[in-house]
């Protein structure tokens, strides 16, 4: 778990006007994914709710909003396995990492920012849920009106996969196509574009995706059962 605290309660930052002294060193963001176990099994939806609650309330306590925004973008990029982008965001905002993780960060004024581990990676005991979104999806467009184009998706394993897509396609439909090509269960897939999580009912045309853009797919495969 490295230097990250596995507790799910966020510690209150330093009192306003009294920034904690920044550590003298700055390490690059580590590429390994932090592993942790939740006190109780949670679904993907519950995890998203906890993250939204943190990001919505964190700037109200202490720190600069632009730094919180940069940390949020860097956290999403790192989880999507785009460490180069995450590091560029941190460098651009002059954020230092004494331990090479986003658990403890400092801005150029010496203010400390602490991110809970649930904002950095899903728990190992994340519950896979089958939503009703697939059954609510509108019917697929007829072949006569489909204008297909190659859609590039980058898996969290580092592999790039090209899917045959059209703008009216939903993410749920494309998840099933990725399953047929790579054998990755749709419930294991979490699709991100421009730092936002795409739901199964989201259509490609709603994402404003353009040619040669890449969609990040984080794979949350459940651990093998232990004897």
Swiss-Prot record:
Indicate the segments annotated as coiled coil, or none if absent.
none
Span-the-membrane segments of this chain are none
| Superkingdom in the source lineage | Eukaryota
The cross-references to InterPro entries, in alphabetical order and at most eight, read: DC-UbP/UBTD2_N (IPR032752), DC-UbP/UBTD2_N_sf (IPR038169), Ubiquitin-like_dom (IPR000626), Ubiquitin-like_domsf (IPR029071), Ubiquitin_dom (IPR019956), UBTD1/2 (IPR039869)
Residues covered by region (Disordered) = 1-35
| Entry-linked SUPFAM superfamilies | Ubiquitin-like
Q: Which residues form the Ubiquitin-like domain?
A: 149-224
Pfam families given for it?
UBD, ubiquitin
- Name the residue ranges with Basic and acidic residues bias: 24-35
Q: Which PROSITE patterns match?
A: UBIQUITIN_2
**Function text:** May be involved in the regulation of cellular senescence through a positive feedback loop with TP53. Is a TP53 downstream target gene that increases the stability of TP53 protein by promoting the ubiquitination and degradation of MDM2.
Assembly and partners are described as: Interacts with UBTD1.
What's the protein here called? Answer: Ubiquitin domain-containing protein 1
Q: Which organism is it from?
A: Rattus norvegicus (Rat)
